[in-house]
Each structure stands twice: as structure tokens, then as C-alpha cells.
Amino acid sequence: MKDHEYHALTDAFFQYVEDTVDAGYPDIDCERAGGVLTLSFENKTKVIINKQEPLHQIWVATRENGFHFELQGETWIDNRFGHELKALLTKACTTQAGESVVFP
């Protein structure tokens, strides 16, 4: 994958996360700064999603663990645990928000 393709894919994913949060979860604050997207919850916990351009990965830090996602076909898959990115965000955000959060 070329760098410009990676940036287009990650930018689109970041926008998808922002749009999902803004449309349905007013108690979650979403802030993007450069290649980092931070989701902040009322209980002061955070989920941090960031680009790792040299590796063409997306890294996610949650209260539980850190995850490194690589694009496999059209799906971002964690290279250690095999989690799909949207499913991992759904689980982590639901846990940290204390209410159902879904990234379809």
C-alpha cells in the first residue's frame, strides 16, 4: 500500500468514528489532532486511536490494553489478538462509557 492510500483509508476511518460518536453518543467527546483521535468518557477514561504511518497500521490504546491493526483485505485486524477494529472499539467504548456504544 502506498502512503497516500494509507492516509485516505485512515482518514476515512477516523471520520467514520467521529461521525458515529457525534450522531449517537453525546456523552463521548471526540477530538482529532493530527494523526491522533481521542475519545474521552465522562468517567475520565480515554480510548486513543492513532496512525502509525511507517508501519501502515492503526494503533488503539484502551483502559485494558494496546492493539495494533493492519489492513487485511478491507478490514483492520489486530496483529496480536485477531480482533476486528470496529468490534474492538464497540467493546472498549461500551466498557468505558458504561452504556452500549456500537460501531456498525
From Swiss-Prot:
Transmembrane segments: none
GO biological process, one term: iron-sulfur cluster assembly
InterPro entries: CyaY, Frataxin/CyaY, Frataxin/CyaY_sf, Frataxin_CS
The organism's place on the tree of life at top rank: Bacteria
SUPFAM superfamilies, per database record: Frataxin/Nqo15-like (SSF55387)
CDD domains: Frataxin
Pfam families given in the database record: Frataxin_Cyay
Keyword Iron tagged: yes
Gene Ontology MF terms: ferric iron binding; ferrous iron binding
Phosphoprotein is among the record's keywords: no
Alphabetized UniProt keyword annotations: Iron, Metal-binding
GO cellular component terms given for this protein: cytosol
Recorded family membership: Belongs to the frataxin family.
Function of the molecule: Involved in iron-sulfur (Fe-S) cluster assembly. May act as a regulator of Fe-S biogenesis.
Protein's name in the database: Iron-sulfur cluster assembly protein CyaY
Organism (species): Aeromonas salmonicida (strain A449)
